[in-house]
Amino acid sequence: MERSMYAGRVRSEHIGTTITLKGWVSRRRNLGGLIFIDLRDREGLMQLVVNPENTDAAVVETAESLRSEFVIEVTGTVEAREQANDNLPTGAVELKVEDLKVLNTAKTTPFEIKDGVEASDDTRMRYRYLDLRRPEMLENFKLRAKVTHTIRNYLDDLEFIDVETPMLTKSTPEGARDYLVPSRVSQGHFYALPQSPQITKQLLMNAGFDRYYQIVKCFRDEDLRGDRQPEFTQVDLETSFLNEQEIQDITEGLIAKVMKETKGVEVTLPFPRMSYDDAMNNYGSDKPDTRFDMLLQDLTELVKDVDFKVFAEAPAVKAIVVKGNADKYSRKSIDKLTDFAKQFGAKGLAWVKMTDGVLAGPVAKFLTSIEEKLTDALQIEENDLVLFVADTLEIANNTLGALRNQIAKELDMIDNTKFNFLWVVDWPMFEWSEEEGRYMSAHHPFTLPTEDSAAELEGDLSKVRAVAYDIVLNGYELGGGSLRINQKDLQERMLKALGFSEESAYEQFGFLLEAMDYGFPPHGGLALGLDRFVMLLAGKDNIREVIAFPKNNKASDPMTQAPSLVADKQLEELALHVELENE
């Protein structure tokens, strides 16, 4: 028989009607001579009732045989429950079973199909198809679908054109490691899976498309963490003839529309702006979480004459004040914070507490000469804990920024009902890579430098600023964009500044440079991380919760066992030979 409706949508207005439902057995129990079955489908649970006294014996026998996760088809009459269950949307009704069929049986599942499941991440991923049956997971993907639907409608209304760009493209430097795909036809040659459609979307602007968008898969072979996956989805935009403010306005409108449609939240526009330098100096992060205070304070000048070499000789001394919580931090717990700080390059962590109106702690004796000034500068009060880092400015900022976030989580200082958006602007064009021993693009090599700093491409690269902008939500980079270079000579200068010879520049990017000979318009754009956005909207802390079939922290899939070895014949066709490290 045809299904009449979803089980989770049966309501009081259906009382007295005969319906057919199909789904999974969530549980079965015998009580007071009756058999109760909870039927689950994607819309929720519905209680079924089998009364052996007035039900066909074959139906009763089938009902008795049911186990969790059996797939069934049931027909019956909707009746009012004697005692309503206010915890269920269907709690006012139940289905009096008249016919029952088992469509498929099921083994005992490795974990219970319910929210709050107690199973390891790898077990959940090994049986992802079972994990996805849980109501919480289904809701995540309904939310994701609503977000993408809203985005498409918004951009379609603004006359953006949805264009698919290639998945098999050219490997280019300046970025994370590429995923490579060997060519069978051109042996020894490789495609790369795109880290983003950056160059192709710029070429679409040269083609006159004017406004492009795509919800697109991207790939990066990088170390993983909670908000990263090797394959991810981004909302990709590019426009011609718009300035950065106009692009930001479009983005803000898109986000406001998504927030209203999916969360019922009215966000205030325009979003706040914060310079990159202010973000790093005050929050210790280029993606600051502004839902709580505890800003970084610069004490370099104040402590330069104290009798404590660690402070007096450090290039920078900065601090954060943990207000009113010093009593929660014993020496042992501060030692743990010190170990945490060392992960970010700090040599150690100095601290003092305000106890009975005076500063106490290992370094307090070195600060007596400036205690009053220090107390005033930091507004230290009773039961405050002050944490200091003395090092380079970069290490001090990064370390205290990470400590700030860690402590806020430990002390439950963050209001998780808030959605704090902001733009981080005025970015440096380059960042120094200790590993590479050279300057690298802070974003990518096609970012437009500011007009007043472009001359430094042949001088001090640390002084070059970019017409770039990142959008941040609650301490996460939601996306980033920039105006792009559209003049060939400037693009050549940019590549030269990054260490490309003329020959290597044309070998890697010749097709883009050639395109700049043919009337390339001014253009710019942005990309938003869809997975990360949905994760934050769903209140999760790992994007695996909003990706149907994600990879684990080893970039592998416990369900399909990907990546896997392949047959020698396949390798021979590709003219490849694999040597494993342990061979």
Curated annotation (Swiss-Prot):
**Location of the protein in the cell:** Cytoplasm
- Give GO terms for biological process: aspartyl-tRNA aminoacylation
Molecular-function GO terms, alphabetical: aspartate-tRNA ligase activity; ATP binding; catalytic activity, acting on a protein; nucleic acid binding; transferase activity
What EC number(s) does the entry state? Answer: 6.1.1.12
Q: What does this protein do?
A: Catalyzes the attachment of L-aspartate to tRNA(Asp) in a two-step reaction: L-aspartate is first activated by ATP to form Asp-AMP and then transferred to the acceptor end of tRNA(Asp).
Q: What NCBIfam families has UniProt attached to this entry? A: aspS_bact, PRK00476.1
Protein name as annotated: Aspartate--tRNA ligase
